[in-house]
Regions:
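ATP-dependent carboxylate activation and anion-phosphoryl transfer catalytic cores
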Residues: 56-58, 110-198
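Active-site nucleotide/adenylate-binding loops and adjacent lid/helix of ATP-dependent enzymes
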Residues: 2-129, 170-174
Length: 198
């Protein structure tokens, strides 16, 4: 089964694998400090607060919030310890590393990036995810500082239909002039129109 979109995967994969798209369960499986609405944080700090499941533009609705014991997040959301470091996305084909890119997040937002750039770096399939790669051909994993934050039963389509090494997302509510030497790649998704590709 090869999927391009998370909604296709969610509707077709066996229910026993749907935990991958439940970011709270994924975080617990990975041993992170986290909890749903109704469970408060153990210490005052900054945490990532995001929807438990969101199949389109999966960081939509995510934010960094300072929480204290006794604070509650909205129903349907969960809190998780905040990670810092490089934001990396990796495609694996039956566990073998394929397309790997580094994201440059927008300052103050978790759901937008200013650019993505292909990189040449060896990143083994995370052991904590077991043998998922033996069941699904393509698995895309996003990490921050080496910590897995999202898993998708699909490949990263953003780098599939062109030969570019760097892509600049273009958003509906922003004007991004065409960078020198770039070409347009139409790839609409939610509030994204596509990419300038170099």
């Amino acid at each position: 089964m090869d999927f391009r979109n998370d909604d296709e995967a969610w509707q077709q994969i066996p229910w026993k694998h749907l935990w991958v798209y439940d970011k709270l369960i994924l975080s617990k499986k990975l041993g992170y400090l986290c909890g749903p609405s109704g469970i408060t944080v153990p210490t005052a700090d900054e945490y990532v607060v995001r929807p438990i499941t969101n199949l389109q533009m999966m960081s939509v609705g995510a934010s960094i919030q300072r929480l204290e014991p006794g604070d509650h997040v909205e129903p349907g959301y969960f809190w998780c310890q905040k990670f810092t470091g490089e934001h990396i996305t990796v495609d694996y084909f039956y566990g073998k590393q394929d397309t790997t890119a580094k994201g440059f997040p927008r300052e103050g937002r978790l759901d937008r990036f200013d650019k993505w750039e292909l990189i040449d770096r060896e990143i083994p399939f995370p052991e904590k995810l077991g043998l998922l790669w033996n069941w699904m051909p393509w698995i895309n994993i996003e990490m921050i500082g080496g910590n897995v934050i999202e898993v998708h039963f699909r490949y990263n389509d953003d780098f599939r239909n062109h030969n570019g090494k760097v892509i600049y997302p273009v958003w509906k509510d922003e004007d991004l002039p065409q960078p020198e030497g770039s070409t347009w790649y139409n790839s609409p998704c939610q509030d994204r129109l596509g990419f300038w590709v170099i």
